[in-house]
Amino acid sequence: LPYGIDITPDGKVWFARLHTDEIGSIDPDSGKITMIATPFRGPRRLRADAAGKLWITAFPESAIVRFDPATSRFTRFDLPLSPKGGDTPYALNVDRPRGIVWVNGNQSDSLYTFDIANETWANIPLPRRVTFTRDVEFEPDGTAYTAIAHFPGWHVEDGQSTLIRVQRP
């Protein structure tokens, strides 16, 4: 099941395969498809940073993982929680100009940010409770937006879909 797709700055198409624990790439010139097994379970959404490295959610493992296509190396970053495993990162996106990975925390009613250069985390509590955010997107100034799922409605406190505007602290 392909689940998540992005294009790196070099034009290569990358995708995650959720139930096979793989990521893959498609060379746009040759059409060649390359599959790579991941050392973690449940690769879900992935995005590329400005340097062409991929950031991938490890949904059932409470982590995000960086993959460097140049070295084929995976580097794991556990979400900053105690106890470990207490959140499920459904999706992420990379604010390329600022080098920040934004991660949806679906059991904590929050978003996490990961500063790529410093490898440091921040946690941003959301103004709503019992949320299940699905993705993150940005304005040019770095303001982030996340959406609360609308289906099934019991995922959210009042059953209403919501768009939330978030500023990084």
Which functions belong to the PLM regions below?
Residues 133-169:
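Blade-level signature of beta-propeller repeat domains, shared across WD40, Kelch, NHL, RCC1
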Residues 1-10, 39-51, 61, 82-98, ...:
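Beta-rich, blade/repeat-based domains predominating
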Residues 7-8, 17, 27, 48-49, ...:
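Residue-level signal for WD-repeat beta-propeller blades
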Residues 13-19, 54-60, 95, 101-107, ...:
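Conserved beta-strand positions in repeat-built beta-propeller and related beta-rich domains
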Residues 27-31, 68-72, 115-119, 167-169:
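Short loop/turn segments that connect beta-strands within beta-propeller blades
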Residues 10, 19-20, 30, 51, ...:
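Surface-exposed loop/turn positions within WD40 beta-propeller blades
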Residues 21-25, 62-66, 109-112, 159-165:
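A short loop-to-beta-strand structural motif that recurs across blades of beta-propeller domains
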Residues 32-37, 73-82, 120-125:
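A short beta-strand motif characteristic of beta-propeller blades
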